[in-house]
Amino acid sequence: MEFYLSSDCASLARYVSKVVYLEDNDIAHIYDGELHIHCSKIGSEDFSFRTVQKLELELSKIKKGPYDNFMQKEIYEQCETTKNVMRGRVDAFTNRVVLGGLENWLTELRRAKRIIMIASKASFHSCLAARPIFEELMEVPVNVELALDFVDRNCCIFRNDVCIFVSRSGETTDTINALNYCIKKEAVTIGVVNCSGSSISRFTHCGVHTNTGPEKGIATTKSYTSQYIALVMIALWMSEDLVSKIERRKEIIQALTIVPSQIKEVLELEPLIIELCDKKLKQHDTFLLLGRGYQFASALEGASKMKEISYVHSESILTNELGHRVLAVASDNPPIIAFATKDAFSPKIASCIDQIIERKGNPIIICNKGHKIWEQDKQKGNVVTLEVPQTVDCLQGILNVIPLQLISYWLAIKKDIGVDLPRDSAMSAPDI
């Protein structure tokens, strides 16, 4: 009998059909054609019993299957990948988050005087999306840094800082350089990566694996939403000892459990988005995306995807900056996509959208289902709405970014652009 050992079951899909997943403290001993699993944890039985499971990944997980492109496949996989990142970690019955990869550093992490999140590209946007909930739950300063700029500035780092490094591959050069810098400064480091054997996962003190699976498309789609959830879970876990945040934590944990099913609802917008791209968007080469609060990160990520995949100029703008000469551009009728889901800023965002409509703009509004504020304008043809399910404010960006992924994808398809390998990409096609 042959045994294969790997940190990623995707690499074994073409060789095996059954796997045994080791858990924390397991030691696998292979001798004379037999596998024995021992538990090294003190107080546990010497032998551990692990179920032999069918490798569900198989070749289908690293092939397109019924989809035309890997990007489309990976957009649709987000229902499953968001479940995977929470599996065994989020307990809706006890309202607790368990992150075994951080437990050994519990004391140091909860004593943090400052949290610094460091990343590049889409991972940087996921950090921006999670920053407000860290500030709210932890009540400490939270910085988000672009890895290259962070190193260039020789930032001040102290021993009581916690530095979180986020990367899809775990091999992003700029992020690794920033990690080495923080290690020299003796800060506590956390890695949030998809590949458990990567450089960032090995060099950080502790970490969270996103369990996203292979992402073969250049555009980051499912990794973005998985990183977003992983960071929210870290914020929930680190704030568990704060009594004043109990009710807020419960609200978020309960909302996390239904995110996968809500993503499925969002994906049902695809036929409407295809029609929208075909009739209204494909002839344009400039787009403006408006967001505020949690949704500014969604605007940044959406604009990035449209540049990267659709080859259009797209700009993300804080909604309250609309009056600073942006309305002059809006009068030229570039498509404006506004995030207007319900949160603390909804009335102000609605006011900005009204200003756009008054200037003969025809915004595309991403709003919650049942939000009737623009119903009259919709009937007049002044606006188009893409309605997504409502969730707690700090998670709404997970649902809001998916329509932008679909818009970017279908704009590229309408222009006959190869979405999996866009031109002039600074990244190589990943196989992680």
Curated annotation (Swiss-Prot):
Residues 105-244, 277-422 form the SIS domain. PROSITE patterns: SIS (PS51464). Transmembrane segments: none annotated. Pfam families: SIS. GO terms for molecular function: carbohydrate derivative binding; glutamine-fructose-6-phosphate transaminase (isomerizing) activity. InterPro entries: GlmS/AgaS_SIS, GlmS/FrlB_SIS, SIS_dom, SIS_dom_sf. It comes from the Eukaryota. Keywords: Repeat. CDD domains: SIS_GlmS_GlmD_1 (cd05008), SIS_GlmS_GlmD_2 (cd05009). The keyword Glycoprotein does not apply. The keyword Repeat applies. GO terms for biological process: chitin biosynthetic process; fructose 6-phosphate metabolic process; protein N-linked glycosylation; UDP-N-acetylglucosamine metabolic process. PANTHER family: GLUCOSAMINE--FRUCTOSE-6-PHOSPHATE AMINOTRANSFERASE, ISOMERIZING, GLUTAMINE--FRUCTOSE-6-PHOSPHATE TRANSAMINASE (ISOMERIZING). This is Uncharacterized protein YMR085W. The lineage of its organism: Eukaryota, Fungi, Dikarya, Ascomycota, Saccharomycotina.
